[in-house]
Amino acid sequence: MRSARLVLAGILGASLLTGVSVGSASATSAPTLASCKTAIASQEISSGKLTVATDNPVYTPWFVNNKPSNGQGYESAFVYALANILGVAKTNVAWAYEPFDSSYTPGHKSFDFDINEISDTPDRAKVVTFSDSYYDVNQSIIALKGNKIVTMHSAADLKGYQFGDQIGTTGLTYINQYIKPTKPARVYSTLDQAVAALQSKQIDAIVVDTPTGQYMASSQIVDAKNNPLATQVGQFPSVGEHYSLLFQKGNALAACVNVGIAALKANGTLAAITKKWLGIYTSVPTLQP
């Protein structure tokens, strides 16, 4: 759904990376973990430094306490694991701010990559470069406990309700393409605005990725005594959506990042991070199409 970023800090800036070969490999050779470590440690790509950006605020379970640099939360932990396997020290990873809805616009990017629950979609891929998937996504419905929508369990049952969501998100796309409500979904500039509309009963429900939805229902939408006011109605079957790191179009670093992601999957690190930070979300019931 959203985004974060790493800014190149070497002699070659992010704007100069397009078309650069990785390490000693030629432009037609597939990079290896060893060649990528060499390329990143040298001045060929980033002189061993990466600057990462994400939105503000960021949410549990992707980040914790709105502090991307603490290594807590799925996306923060993943970034540092990725940096480590590519030979970048934790102290050489810097974080910066990038609004979600501007991350996937065309043009120069002042970061290495952006991580903020950004879904790899065909339209976005026309103007930016995406990494391989680091998380496969299900969308789910969040509603206030007293709303009748909480008893609905299929897309057909949901059509008569008022949905709302943040502009540019795949949650909003899911509402329009799969739920197809009879009332046009209301669109908000930020997710916080959509949540406020839900709390004030201007809308009946929001569609977000399952982990974000679980956090909203259990910890974000609460009363003065922190009792949950909302519930996660259920999650939809997968439609092939996944989250990827976002790069400036043609950024050569993406090839090395893909090598790193593959290595984290192969050695079990990504699975361990998933179990630690997202394990409880596998039990959310699935809604019928």
What name fits each language-model region?
Residues 88, 108-118, 161-162, 200-212, ...:
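Alpha-to-beta junction loops
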Residues 71-85, 118-120, 136-195, 210-215, ...:
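Bilobed "Venus flytrap"/periplasmic-binding protein-like clamshell domains
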Residues 102, 118-126, 176-177, 204-239:
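A ligand-binding cleft/hinge motif common to bilobed small-molecule-binding domains
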Residues 136-143, 218-259, 280-289:
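Periplasmic-binding protein-like
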Residues 92-157:
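Acidic, polar ligand-binding/catalytic clefts
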Residues 1-27:
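Secretory targeting and sorting signals
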Residues 30-31, 76-80, 85, 169, ...:
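Extended ligand-binding regions for polar small-molecule ligands
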Residues 31-114:
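Extracytoplasmic small-molecule ligand-binding "clamshell" domains
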